[in-house]
Amino acid sequence: MLILTRRIGETLMVGDEVTVTVLGVKGNQVRIGVNAPKDIAVHREEIYQRIQREKQNQEEQDN
């Protein structure tokens, strides 16, 4: 795992097309902005996990 330190307004690059910018810090919450091409899905981890479970459930029902 790469660990980086960024300040508000600073950005990091993921590959050539995805940027992650620190928008704000309030208490233990960090607001980030993600710019990515439309063909790259960006989700919070809990949403991604739910999508994966739903896909798995659908595949099981199809079999």
From Swiss-Prot:
InterPro entries: CsrA (IPR003751), CsrA_sf (IPR036107). It comes from the Bacteria. GO terms for molecular function: mRNA 5'-UTR binding. SUPFAM superfamilies: CsrA-like (SSF117130). Its main location: cytoplasm. GO terms for cellular component: cytosol. PANTHER family: CARBON STORAGE REGULATOR (PTHR34984:SF1). Homodimer; the beta-strands of each monomer intercalate to form a hydrophobic core, while the alpha-helices form wings that extend away from the core. A key translational regulator that binds mRNA to regulate translation initiation and/or mRNA stability. Mediates global changes in gene expression, shifting from rapid growth to stress survival by linking envelope stress, the stringent response and the catabolite repression systems. Usually binds in the 5'-UTR; binding at or near the Shine-Dalgarno sequence prevents ribosome-binding, repressing translation, binding elsewhere in the 5'-UTR can activate translation and/or stabilize the mRNA. Its function is antagonized by small RNA(s). Belongs to the CsrA/RsmA family. This is Translational regulator CsrA.
